Amino acid sequence: MKHIIPDYTFPADPHEAVESDFAALDALYAGRKAYYGDFHAHSNSGGTSDGHTAPEEWLKAMKELHMDFIGLMDHRQVRHMYLDSFDPEYFLYGTEPAGLWNDPQLDCHYLMIFQERGALERVLQAFPAEFEFEGGVEGHFKYIRMDRSRFDAIRDAVLREGGAFVNAHPMQQIKSDDLRDFDFGPGTALETIYACAYPEQLNPHTIENYRLWLDMLASGRKMINTSTADDHGAPTNAGVNTVYSAEKNGPAYVRQLIKGDLNAGFVGIKMCMDEHPVGSTAAYREGMTLQVKVDDVHPLLFDPAEKWRVDIHTDEGLAYSAPLKQHFAAAIPVKRRKFYWAEVIRERDGAPAAIGNPIWLE
């Protein structure tokens, strides 16, 4: 069984499939549809933006690429969110600052993604020493070195505003061997699939970030994973995530990100543990069942001629694996483990079509 990380082996933790009516899973996903999009891209919005594609050109390209949303995370400014072409049905509010820490002396990039436009400015204004935000639609802010405690305070402010806080391209930016330097705290996420400068998910950057995420899970950290192409050039769909939402608009996708109820990649993974959704924590009890379905695939990125498989993992290893077939469904008994999660893998080379997020147990 090939896997994206060539030297990584999942120990066996076998679970036998059980019969299920999938009523709990179907109830959780009732009224929700699969939407595809990238939380992290850049546009040519003027000012200090460094993307090559104007927002109005992004809107046209998204239809051709079968993308439902894009997070325009243009640097050092807020003006992109005020353009007439910024449509909140398709674009997400936010920006990508740099975190420059004093102790340890490390640099990171992170995303602040919001459900409403004014939240970003409120956070910037709440930290004058850290951003020196000039205010107003044309106001810019700076990347200023700060203590890690102030960075954590910014994170807390973002979360209080109902925003998402994401560690962007972590292994490509943070030069450290200490997991604590990659851990932005409870309620945050990190990018695993990183297709920047690559046409698809199987690339050295994804391998590095995916291994980091596995190490963080193994260390007991609750960390959500996402996918991105961090697109600065011609529009691409190489970094899409799959989000099941009852609404088709930016704030709804951000709410699912905050919950951790989504998966990286272009194949949708539906999963629950009894009534508990992806991204949640459940109290273990005897007789629980994990239910998984794979019904939705991106029409341009998924190749039905390839062979794919669905793997279900626990903290102790590979619990279940089966070929991906149309309308895939599997149920396994829940054992006393720390978490369960699922992924979809291309058989010939181990490339991930989807990396799901966990359901944790306590």
Predicted regions: what is each one?
Residues I4-A168, D177, G185, I193-A195, ...:
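A metal-dependent hydrolase metal-coordination microenvironment
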Residues M1-A34, G46, P55, S219-N225, ...:
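C-terminal functional module detector
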Residues P170-Q172:
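Conserved catalytic scaffold of divalent metal-dependent phosphoesterases
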